[in-house]
Amino acid sequence: AKSLSADTSAEGRWHEDEFGYGKNYRYLSPDGHVLDLVWEAEHYQAPAELQSKILTRASKKPLQGIPVKRIDHLNLMSSDVTAVKESFQRHLGFRTTERVVDGDVEIGAWMSSNILGHEVATMKDMTGGHGKLHHVAFFYGNAQHNIDAAEMFRDYDIPIEAGPDTHGITQGQFLYVFEPGGNRIELFGEP
């Protein structure tokens, strides 16, 4: 937050407790994405009837829906991939794990702050747009899980945009669908 607040182009400010988070710093990426730095959060406590016997689970798996394990990554559309990538590196300590360059223009970058292949990706928005979300990815497990989900989506007439298949970048398993609000969701897994 100190690095971002010193950067006048980041346009950030502090916010108090919102949505179960403590004090957080909201700022704009170089492309206009609204981002929050959060480091305190209320941890979910399941009611007694939903508590899992498996201690590493926040609650029992649901009997309906898809029991994803965690949010895996965000993919942001950007007019300037390099500027967004460098902001994540300079201010948040991310490192670039993979990138795609067309001629001398960076059109994709995958970044991580830990051992994951990526937590944030940014891709060139060929429409000229600014600050858009491409998708939110949830970690679902392995290739068979995505095949099972695809069969369920077909049975219930939920349109599949792409997959199941394997990404060339990251080598992760993927399945893309749109949720009812129109947001693109990726179910992401390991090979």
Name these PLM-found stretches.
Residues 76-117:
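Core segments of cupin and vicinal oxygen chelate
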Residues 124-126, 134-137, 164-167:
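Short helix/strand-bridging catalytic loops that position acidic/His residues to coordinate divalent metals
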Residues 38, 87-89, 110-112, 120-125, ...:
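A structural feature that tracks compact, well-ordered secondary-structure segments
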Residues 1-67, 70-79, 109-110, 157-191, ...:
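Vicinal oxygen chelate
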Residues 49-82, 95, 131-138:
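N-terminal beta-strand motif that seeds the catalytic metal site of vicinal oxygen chelate
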Residues 89-97, 116, 138-145, 155-159:
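Short helix-capping and hinge/turn segments at secondary-structure transitions, especially at repeat
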Residues 103, 128-130, 169:
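Short glycine/serine/proline-enriched coil/turn segments at secondary-structure junctions
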